[in-house]
Design a protein with these regions (language model features):
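Bacterial Sec-dependent N-terminal signal peptides
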Residues: 1-31
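Glycan-recognition and catalytic cores of secretory/periplasmic carbohydrate-active enzymes
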Residues: 26-303
Length: 303
């Protein structure tokens, strides 16, 4: 009987040790998450203290060449700082961050009228939309809808897409020879349109978002499911004029950040539409990224 019970005891010990290891692993994961939250809070505390003491409205974008880089409200990254504050409030529950998030969000009010580039979705989505979704700020709804109207003015019906950048004479975009450039980043702005339809009941925004997603699905991707950065269109006919990059290494390379814009963008489009094609494309982009032989072991891709 003792010999027979020995394997049972070993098995029981293994289960107990496995449970202990599992608990320790979960606790370690919690510690990592909390450590990161604490670090973010410390950095944001330092930065908001600097800004508040300055008496100015400053919008930090990045730390570069030994100093903080602040940007005007029409910069495409202007919504990221208030967005970070909203997430910090959500993670900590500290009302201090709610107050600061609202303050820096509402400094961007005039962005709702911005029509000269497509990134109003980034700017208002990260700030006002997060305020609504994370904190129930109902008073932000009109700003979100107005911003969607502004973004919709960039829709080129003949091509079925939202034009990303203007090509005014003298701009670097014009010097590239583009007519109606659309960048993969634009997929990120569609969430603003989907939300505007949900909030207003006006399907115009939804239809523009779907048209843009479908046209991008058709033209932006290579056979291996990597994507180009820039597709240049004839805005009247939808003819593809150029397949280029603006920030990648070369036209036929897969710019790392752009692949993630595509992955997030089509996952988000599936969430709003339940169109299986979008989910399938997101999976294909995921497979391209994570099965790529040049992806480093730390999973941080080269530029």
């Amino acid at each position: 009987m003792k010999l027979r019970s020995f394997p049972v005891k070993i098995f029981a010990m293994a289960i107990a040790m496995g449970s202990l290891w599992s608990c320790q692993t979960k606790e370690a994961a919690k510690d990592i998450i909390q450590d990161n939250v604490d670090n973010a809070v410390a950095q944001l505390t330092l930065q908001t203290d600097i800004i508040e003491k300055s008496g100015k409205f400053l919008n930090p974008r990045t730390y570069e060449n030994g100093k903080m880089n602040y940007v005007p409200i029409d910069d495409w990254c202007s919504g990221f700082f208030p967005g970070t504050l909203w997430y910090t409030y959500k993670l900590t529950g500290d009302k201090k961050w709610e107050t600061l998030a609202a303050k820096y969000t509402e400094q961007l009010d005039s962005v709702k009228h911005l029509k000269w580039h497509h990134d109003v979705g980034f700017m208002i989505g990260s700030s006002y939309l997060n305020g609504l979704l994370l904190d129930g700020k109902e008073e932000y709804k009109p700003v979100i809808i107005e911003a969607a109207k502004s973004l919709s003015t960039r829709f080129r019906k003949g091509a079925g897409i939202i034009q990303s950048w203007n090509v005014d004479k003298g701009t670097w975009q014009a010097e590239r020879g583009w007519t109606c450039p659309v960048i993969i980043d634009n997929m990120m702005n569609l969430e603003l349109l989907f939300e505007a339809t949900r909030l207003s009941g006006d399907s115009t925004y939804y239809n523009i978002a779907v048209s843009h997603a479908n046209t991008t699905l058709k033209n932006h991707f290579r056979e291996d499911n990597s994507c180009y950065h820039v597709i240049d269109y004839n805005p009247e006919t939808g003819e593809v004029l150029h397949k280029h990059t603006a920030q990648g290494y070369a036209h036929e390379t897969a710019w790392a950040r752009g692949q993630v814009w595509a992955l997030y963008g089509y996952t988000m489009c599936y969430r709003y539409t339940k169109d299986e094609r979008y989910l399938e494309q997101a999976q294909k982009v995921y497979d391209f990224i994570f099965n790529h032989p040049n992806l480093p072991k730390d999973l941080v891709p080269y530029w």
